[in-house]
A protein has these predicted regions:
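N-terminal periplasmic accessory domains that precede
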Residues: 29, 73-76, 113-115, 140-164, ...
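Outer-membrane beta-barrel signature, preferentially recognizing the C-terminal barrel domain
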Residues: 450-499, 504, 524-536, 541-544, ...
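Conserved C-terminal beta-signal and adjacent last beta-strands/turns
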Residues: 575-693
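Extracytoplasmic beta-strand/coil segments of soluble accessory domains associated
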Residues: 50, 74-109
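Short acidic/polar hinge/loop motifs at secondary-structure boundaries
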Residues: 106-132
Length: 693
């Protein structure tokens, strides 16, 4: 309790009113630049929560969820030791991770990850398998969490389902309705999910910029920006699974979504402007998966993604006026195919190998139309149609050496072809788990990866915000980054976890602002740095106090360094150490029925490129009530009670001088979940990580 009160007081004291989630296309792009990454050993003395299986740490999610208010997968993942919510991005031991659904590939950026994971009921989760290094057979690289949501064949034939309604209030209200249904009969499963999110949002951004130009003039730009938006988001899925035998299964699924957004941005101060956005996003995905009892897997998937949007800008700046409309569009067609094989060999050895091929067609364009007298020419129209081909060949092996040692290694060779790049890459992975005794587990991991920019980022586009004073532009010359990561994981007494890691990223890229000298514009653009490196330590310590309080303290310490010798005319080489602490407390008020959650987080100041990021923190409280023979759950909560979770970045570096102040509102909400028929949801997610946001 003392720790809780200290953390609450610290979070209340931090002067960090800040960032709300960006809603428009321009602001979501601009916000990208501010912060983004054995023999079974079980817990004794209580029901097992985590066990070590080779290179995996497997968590019993129903046990972790029992006393928590999480009703969706996003909130459920935050209960896993080492997973934190870093300003809207989930991280594992301070780094980004992949999400797998029943071993299938799932990769998203922070915004898409939030939206899709929040649409999935937490009740579907059986286990979560944490892999700090993911073997090549899973198609992804780096750290991963595999979610086990296989259907429960022990349930009787008939219908099962879950209905959810939710209301969240910040400055404006958002509503959500979700229905998920499953029909089980003998060897056949048919499922259908639908979710509708809708409501309004409001946020403000106050920006101060001391802007020097080549003509010797200096402009003191002060703007106050208010943005109002209205959203409707629809997500649906239909799936069919037929199990011929235990290891012989055919699956067919269709997933679709349709989202609309209407936003208006009004700017006052040195810049006066009205800026209206309209966006529609449509996605259709069909996936066929066939698993044979011989260990062979066949998979084919087709995805269609279409995002038209418009912008209407009328603006008066100190240097002139802008009046024009913008139409932009991205259309993606993607095909994926996978053939894999696994063998169980003598002596406890395992062997897996396979080949993957994907073809993506990206059709993007942007057109400008003048609607008045402009003192500056708008950018030229752009048009692009290009294909991307990826061939991946992999092989891996795993084995148990004696009673104390497990290892798994894999190697993937990948050929990437696009108009910008033609190259082969090799990705080794290695994981070694050593168990000297039942109370100690040591795991050493190594992985390598290459990150490719979003398709839209590579286009010659320009999107305006802050009344046209800010420009978000593409970079066709942006190079992919190469990442190398090593971790050492130590599990003590089956519950205390400690992780040490080192990351090195060559050609690291991130979006950064720059006050141009030739004209009065702040340009936001993704650029390659020389490198980024990071040393980190994490400790996760759970503690139970009788039968009335369960607590877990997670502390992360990081030393990071970023170097860019070609950052316009102000190269930088910056390093900083920062610390983040997270304390979760769950009070049992009435066993099996009523629980109180009180959580807090605090983070010290940090750097990103030439940004200085101040300290931030938050305190959240929630009440969970289970009733109606445990079929209904009511959750009432208030997040960020003291409105201190936002980050207001400052730039005072070289000839760059800027400060941003983002609105920050506490969030209150209520959700009600009703389940019938012993419902266990299942879902397959679609990779839209590199599509236009």
């Amino acid at each position: 309790m003392i720790l809780v009160l200290c953390m609450a007081a610290t979070a209340a004291y931090a002067q960090t009113d800040g960032a709300a989630t960006a809603t428009s296309t321009a602001d979501s792009l601009r916000m990208d630049s501010i912060i983004h990454a054995l023999p079974e050993v079980m817990v004794k003395g209580q029901r097992p929560v985590v066990k070590v299986e080779g290179s995996k740490l497997t968590y019993d999610m129903p046990q972790l969820l029992k006393k928590e208010g999480a009703d969706n997968v996003y909130d459920a993942l935050k209960l896993i030791p080492g997973v934190t919510d870093d300003n809207g991005s989930l991280t594992l031991a301070g780094n980004a991770f992949n999400v797998l659904i029943n071993g299938k590939h799932y990769q998203m950026d922070a915004a898409q990850l939030n939206a899709l994971l929040k649409s999935l009921p937490a009740s579907r989760l059986k286990h979560a398998e944490v892999m700090y290094t993911t073997p090549a057979r899973y198609e992804v690289r780096g750290a991963s969490i595999n979610l086990d949501i296989a259907s429960d064949t022990s349930q009787p034939d008939g219908w099962q389902g879950e209905l959810t309604g939710a209301w969240n209030q910040e400055h404006e209200a958002m509503w959500s309705e979700r229905g998920a249904f499953l029909y089980h009969h003998n060897k056949l499963d048919i499922d259908f999910n639908y979710e509708h999110d809708h409501g309004k949002s409001y946020r403000t951004t106050d920006e101060t910029s001391l802007h020097a130009l080549d003509d010797g003039t200096t402009h003191d730009i002060v703007t106050d920006e208010a943005q109002r938006s209205r959203d409707h988001k629809h997500l649906w899925r239909m799936g069919l699974d037929y199990a011929f035998t235990e290891n012989h299964r055919l699956s067919l699924s269709y997933t679709g979504s349709y989202n609309t957004e209407h936003a208006r941005e009004d700017v006052t101060g040195n810049v006066t402007a009205a800026n209206a956005y309209r966006t529609k996003k449509k996605m259709h995905d069909v996936m066929l998966d066939y698993q044979l009892p011989t260990g062979t897997t066949l998979n084919a998937e087709y995805t269609y993604y279409d995002t038209p949007s418009t912008q209407q800008l009328t603006s008066t700046l100190p240097t002139g006026e802008l009046h024009f409309d913008t139409d932009e569009h991205q259309r993606i067609n993607r095909w994926k195919f996978h053939l894999g094989q696994e063998h169980s060999l003598a002596g406890g050895w395992g062997l897996n190998y396979g080949v993957r091929y994907s073809l993506t067609n990206d059709h993007s364009w942007q057109a400008f139309t003048s609607t008045g007298d402009n003192t500056a020419a708008h950018p030229a129209d752009s048009y692009s149609r290009q294909n991307e081909d990826i061939v991946n060949i992999y092989a891996g092996t795993n084995s148990k050496i004696g009673k104390k040692l497990d290892f798994e290694a894999s190697l993937a060779a990948e050929y990437y072809h696009s108009p910008a790049w033609h190259q082969w890459n090799v990705y080794p992975t290695f994981s070694l788990t050593y168990i000297p005794s039942s109370s100690h587990v040591l795991q050493l991991n190594f992985s390598s990866d290459k990150k490719f920019p979003d398709y839209w980022t590579l286009q010659s586009f320009t999107v305006y915000s802050n009344g046209g004073y800010n420009e978000v532009v593409g970079n066709p010359g942006l190079k992919p980054s190469s990442n190398y990561r090593t971790q050492l994981v130590y599990v003590l007494r089956h519950k205390y976890q400690f992780v040490a890691w080192f990351n090195y990223t060559d050609d690291y890229f991130v979006q950064t602002p720059y006050q141009r000298h030739d004209r009065l514009t702040v340009q936001y653009k993704y650029l390659n740095f020389d490198y980024s490196q990071q040393w980190g330590l994490q400790a996760s310590v759970p503690q139970r106090f009788g039968n009335w309080l369960d607590s877990r303290l997670t502390v992360i310490g990081v030393w990071m360094k970023e170097k860019c010798s070609a950052f316009y005319d102000i190269p930088f080489n910056r390093d900083i150490a920062w610390v983040m602490a997270n304390l979760r407390n769950n009070f049992t008020l009435v066993p099996d029925h009523l629980y109180l959650n009180l959580d807090g987080m605090i983070r010290s100041k940090a750097h990103q490129a030439i940004y200085d990021l101040p300290a931030s923190g938050n305190v959240d409280v929630g009440l969970k009530y289970i009733f109606w023979k445990k079929r209904a759950t009511l959750h009432v909560f208030c997040n960020d009670i003291f409105e201190t979770s936002g980050i207001d970045p400052v730039i005072h570096y070289g000839n760059q001088n800027m400060k941003m102040d983002f609105s920050c509102y506490r969030q209150v909400g209520v959700s009600l979940v009703y389940r019938f028929g012993g419902y266990k949801d299942k879902s397959k997610e679609v990779d839209t990580s590199r599509f236009k946001k």
